[in-house]
Each structure stands twice: as structure tokens, then as C-alpha cells.
């Protein structure tokens, strides 16, 4: 398996402790994001990995479900691919916990500048909001080129919409500010 490091988890001491407790992740072991995976399907099938991973996920209460099961199963046995292939919110928002760690900051800024895949993990889905530059404009640009361009999409809870998008926009503005300083 090959994947990108999950910088949101790698940068958080609290979550790293949680992963140590839940899946036995040692403090020096990298943790990957399962949003974009490269797999040797022949080896995957021959090793019957799916059954083992499903069993792990079924028998445990992992906070990140299949991602934790995959990380436990492939601990120390996966390859890292460049972060640009799975850019998650902690990266495109340049969270402080990433900015304060020079090695992670460098990876995040490089991925943000050369993004190939945006992975809208977490609570902010691009289709729940009108077009906002830097957040979901590329999503809408590519959606307009597909057969799904006129499909009705799920909408965010309107009671939280304004507060939440304001928070997200503030994060994006801060990320733009940090990009100017660190790039």
C-alpha cells in the first residue's frame, strides 16, 4: 500500500497518543490518510488483506474506522507518496499545528502549491456552499464538466451554515497569509 502521511494526525500530540492507545501506533511511526491509496491488487487478493482489515475494523471501535484498521494492519509496511496526491483540510488550511513544525510545514506548503487531489475530509464539503475562491472553486469548475453538473447535492444544516462557512473562510484567509510568509 502507498498513501500520503496524514499531517493532521502526525502534527497532533493528543491524537498521536490516541492512536498509540487505539491501534498501537508507536510515536515514531508515520500514520497515513486512507483517502487516496495505491495498492498492488494481485498481492492484496492473494494475501486476503480485505478480510483481515474488515475483521480488525469490526472487532474494534476505531475513531477513524477503516483508516485506523488500515494503519494498524500496514504499520511500518507502507510507502509514502507525495502529499499533493491527497491534500486534506489541515494541509490546505495550513493549521497552526502544522506550521509550527518545519518539516511538516515544508511538505504542506509544497502540496498546497502543487495540489493534484483535494480531499475534502471532515465537516466542510464543497457542495454544501456556494462558490468561495480557494475553498471549493475548483470543485465547481470540474463538476461543471461532468454529467452530474445539474444534480441536487445534499445541503448543510442552514442553522450552522453562516457560522461554519465564516470559520472556514477565516481559516482559508489565514492559510493565504501564511503562504505569503513561508513560500
Residues of each region from the PLM?
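Conserved donor-nucleotide/metal-binding helix-loop-beta segment in metal-dependent transferases, i.e.
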Residues: 1-20
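Flexible glycine/proline-enriched surface loops and loop-helix/loop-strand junctions
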Residues: 18-23, 52-55
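Short, P/G- and charge-enriched loop/turn segments at secondary-structure junctions
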Residues: 21-27, 102-107
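A glycosyltransferase accessory/donor-loop signature
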Residues: 34, 39-183
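A recurrent flexible, glycine/aromatic-enriched loop bordering the glycosyltransferase active site
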Residues: 24-36
Amino acid at each position: 500500500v502507498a498513501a500520503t502521511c496524514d499531517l493532521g494526525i502526525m502534527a497532533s500530540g493528543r491524537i498521536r497518543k490516541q492512536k498509540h492507545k487505539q491501534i498501537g501506533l508507536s510515536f515514531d511511526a508515520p500514520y497515513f490518510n486512507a483517502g487516496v491509496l495505491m495498492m498492488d491488487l494481485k498481492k492484496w487478493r492473494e494475501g486476503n488483506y480485505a478480510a483481515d482489515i474488515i475483521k480488525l475494523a469490526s472487532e474494534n471501535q476505531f475513531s477513524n474506522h477503516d483508516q485506523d484498521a488500515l494503519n494498524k494492519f500496514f504499520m511500518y509496511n507502507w510507502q509514502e507518496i507525495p502529499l499533493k496526491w491527497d491534500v486534506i483540510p489541515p494541509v490546505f488550511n495550513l493549521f497552526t499545528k502544522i506550521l509550527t513544525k518545519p518539516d511538516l510545514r515544508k511538505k504542506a506548503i509544497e502540496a498546497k502549491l502543487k495540489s493534484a487531489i483535494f480531499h475534502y475530509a471532515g465537516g466542510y464539503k464543497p457542495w454544501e456552499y456556494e462558490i468561495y475562491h480557494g475553498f471549493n472553486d475548483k470543485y465547481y469548475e470540474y463538476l461543471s464538466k461532468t454529467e452530474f453538473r445539474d444534480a441536487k447535492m445534499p445541503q448543510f444544516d442552514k442553522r450552522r451554515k453562516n457560522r461554519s462557512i465564516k470559520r472556514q473562510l477565516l481559516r482559508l484567509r489565514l492559510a493565504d497569509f501564511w503562504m505569503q510568509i513561508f513560500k
